[in-house]
């Protein structure tokens, strides 16, 4: 396999330049994170994508700079104290770092959803605020503490630090080794109250119940105070990440990326995800296809929705995968975006080899992929819709006299509004009663509002439905006894309504 490295580097840099001006990125990095370091993106670092997020995306941009500087300086001091032992700690450090980092990314998305919800503060607190805070503490901070203590343990020959698992001892150890500032906003009383169900909610405040020194205690936070606690904790966590990233950039040789190439190993998989990511297009999943296929599956979230851009991105990542994992025989790539339908493109190893030998072969390779039907990528929906409505809308439970419609789902097409649902009629009734209920239910369901679809155009809104598909049962018992089989004693019948001119299915 002949590698045209200049071509490969240029592909990557071109994709990066589409998202952010490279010189501006370096300038912003120097102005906001490290004024001294000088690096070029032609020899790209895998840390570019998380750095981009912390430089340009909210709420990541609100990272605590004092925390970031403190973490960087203390990591640097520990490294200079005992470089050999520091490097030995890196595999364990990276394990905890990535557990924290992936948790953090999920929580950032949850926070964004929290601000878009139209639920009451009470429901939003139960669904989002409390889980966000407890996961910031247990998923992010506790693992970042463990990462730091792994380094301290190795460089100071303190093996007893390796066994600390619970939050309070972790906090005590951090304070003992002068990481006091990292413990601010870590409220163990609130954490214990959430973990043990000691919560009383209203739309104005949250009351936390916990034990302290053997006594029952409580504290109350107004909703705005809880939001402030979450934001401050998030900013501190962000600062810890920036401190680590700054250290990794300054000391690139402490991580031998060539060593971490096994997608089945968590740390290797995590590092590969970073290397297969760009600002705006991030790798979220890497697996080896089970069996003897030697296929690598790569999944991405992306802001790109144009077919030609997705094809080019897929080629860039397939080339990187071929270089880093040369034993694999094929590369299956999918992209996720709220405006895209499910898609994929599959490259064979020989496709990539042909491109690497001669970049002029790209059109031929792409044509071969399309010809053998190894590619399904459709245009993104360009319909102007309320994306938040499409994302968060929940169908209601419709009730009649003695019956309920639940589990309403939208299966509409561009030319037809179609709804399917489950109808529960309650106690055993006569055939005539059941028919009457089905007719009433269809009449009600016909007028049910359906939201737009973010991926493709459908008939939607308050207009009457063209088709209704009802599965009718006696009793609702969550996911039990809802098979559409004659042997299911709870199943009664399947009913379908279509406006005149529409064929039944």
What are these regions (language model features)?
Residues 1-120, 259-397:
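Extended intrinsically disordered or low-complexity regions, especially N/C-terminal cytosolic tails and loops
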Residues 74-75, 164-205:
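Short, mixed-charge amphipathic alpha-helical segments
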Residues 124-171:
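Short, contiguous, well-structured surface segments enriched in hydrophobic/aromatic residues
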Residues 204-215, 331, 468-471:
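Short polybasic amphipathic segments
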Residues 208-260:
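Amphipathic, Lys/Arg-enriched alpha-helical patches that create a basic surface
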Residues 279-293, 394-425:
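Short edge beta-strands and adjacent turn/loop segments
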Residues 397-400, 476-505:
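C-terminal partner/receptor-binding element of secreted or periplasmic proteins
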Residues 418-479:
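Mature extracytoplasmic domains of secretory-pathway proteins
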């Amino acid at each position: 396999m002949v590698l045209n490295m200049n071509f490969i580097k240029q592909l990557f840099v071109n994709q990066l330049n589409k998202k952010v001006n490279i010189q501006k990125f370096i300038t912003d990095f120097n102005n906001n994170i490290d004024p001294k370091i000088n690096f070029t993106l032609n020899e790209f670092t895998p840390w570019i994508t998380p750095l981009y997020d912390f430089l340009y995306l909210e709420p990541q941009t609100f990272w605590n700079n004092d925390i970031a500087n403190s973490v960087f300086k203390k990591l640097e001091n520990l490294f200079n104290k005992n470089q050999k032992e520091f490097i030995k700690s890196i595999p364990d450090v990276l394990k905890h770092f990535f557990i924290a980092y992936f948790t953090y990314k999920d929580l950032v998305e949850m926070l964004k959803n929290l601000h878009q919800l139209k639920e009451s503060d009470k429901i939003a607190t139960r669904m989002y605020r409390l889980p966000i805070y407890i996961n910031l503490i247990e998923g992010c901070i506790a693992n970042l503490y463990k990462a730091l203590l792994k380094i301290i343990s190795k460089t100071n020959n303190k093996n007893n630090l390796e066994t600390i698992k619970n939050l309070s001892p972790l906090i005590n150890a951090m304070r003992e080794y002068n990481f006091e500032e990292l413990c601010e906003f870590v409220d163990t009383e609130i954490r214990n109250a959430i973990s043990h169900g000691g919560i009383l909610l209203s739309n104005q405040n949250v009351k936390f119940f916990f034990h302290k020194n053997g006594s029952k205690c409580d504290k109350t936070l107004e909703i705005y105070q809880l939001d402030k606690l979450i934001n401050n904790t998030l900013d501190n966590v962000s600062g810890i990440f920036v401190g680590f990233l700054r250290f990794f950039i300054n000391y690139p040789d402490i991580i031998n990326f060539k060593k971490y190439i096994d997608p089945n190993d968590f740390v290797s998989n995590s590092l590969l995800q970073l290397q297969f990511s760009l600002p705006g297009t991030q790798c979220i999943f890497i697996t080896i296809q089970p069996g003897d296929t030697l296929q690598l599956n790569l999944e991405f979230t992306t802001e790109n929705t144009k077919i030609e851009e997705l094809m080019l991105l897929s080629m860039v990542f397939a080339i990187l995968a071929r270089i880093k994992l040369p034993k694999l025989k094929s590369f299956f790539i999918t992209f996720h975006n709220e405006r895209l339908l499910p898609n994929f493109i599959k490259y064979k190893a020989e496709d990539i080899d042909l491109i690497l030998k001669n970049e002029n072969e790209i059109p031929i390779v792409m044509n071969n992929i399309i010809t053998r039907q190894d590619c399904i990528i459709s245009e993104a929906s360009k319909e102007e819709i309320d994306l938040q409505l499409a994302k968060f809308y929940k169908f209601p439970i419709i009730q009649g006299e003695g019956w309920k419609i639940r589990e309403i789902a939208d299966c509409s097409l561009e030319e037809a509004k179609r709804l399917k649902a489950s109808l529960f009629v309650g106690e055993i009734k006569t055939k005539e009663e059941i028919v009457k209920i089905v007719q009433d239910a269809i009449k009600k369901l016909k007028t049910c509002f359906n939201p737009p679809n973010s991926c493709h155009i459908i008939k939607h809104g308050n207009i009457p439905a063209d088709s209704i598909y009802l599965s009718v049962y006696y009793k609702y018992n969550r996911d039990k006894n809802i098979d559409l089989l004659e042997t299911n004693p709870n199943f009664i019948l399947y009913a379908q309504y279509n406006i005149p001119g529409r064929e039944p299915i």
